[in-house]
Design a protein with these regions (language model features):
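Short loop/turn segments that flank or connect secondary-structure elements
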Residues: 1-45, 49, 56-174
């Protein structure tokens, strides 16, 4: 396959590179938001309230974990049920450098839009209860002070489709 305009080939290695670029972009943007909310965020190493069983990720992201952590998957012991299988006994993430998108934005103030055919678009917001701050209600934050769900998921679905997968297929982390 030839190179695309962005310099990546269209095969698996090119898609893997684009996924890494996307994760890096998410990390930078999330880092900016973390800086804006430093007084409210209680997230940190060992905080695992968001790291629960039942979280699903895009198949293309699960493949990244499989590729970079084959020995952990083969020989490691998963965290006991109830928390993410990738947590170590101290609550630290064993795949942190390759963690999926959802894990890179956990804890941030989130917003998403629901477009109703019969009515107006409705905005919803949420945040981890540990990071809720009554002195700064979510409803009063500017849209640029929240992580907007949707755009990155769309880009992940595109990468997954290009890899040959079903665009919206999700994989459990356990």
């Amino acid at each position: 396959m030839g190179k695309r305009a962005d310099g990546n080939d269209g095969g698996a290695s090119g898609i893997a590179a684009r996924l890494t670029d996307l994760h890096d972009e998410v990390a930078r943007s999330a880092g900016t938001l973390e800086g804006r909310h430093v007084d409210r965020l209680r997230c940190g190493r060992g905080c695992r309230d968001c790291c629960v069983d039942g979280i699903t990720v895009f198949e293309v992201e699960a493949e990244r974990i499989r590729r970079h952590h084959a020995s952990l998957l083969r020989e490691g012991r998963p965290h006991p049920p109830g928390a993410c299988a990738f947590l170590d006994p101290d609550g630290a993430c064993r795949v942190y450098a390759d963690r999926p998108y959802v894990c890179r934005t956990q804890g941030l103030p989130l917003r998403w839009l629901v477009r109703n055919e019969a009515g107006p678009t409705v905005e919803y917001r949420d945040i981890c209860p540990l990071n809720d701050d009554p002195a700064s209600p979510l409803e009063e934050l500017g849209s640029d002070e929240c992580w907007t769900l949707g755009p990155v998921e769309g880009r992940l679905a595109t990468l997954q489709r290009e890899l040959g997968g079903e665009p919206l297929r999700r994989i459990g982390l356990r």
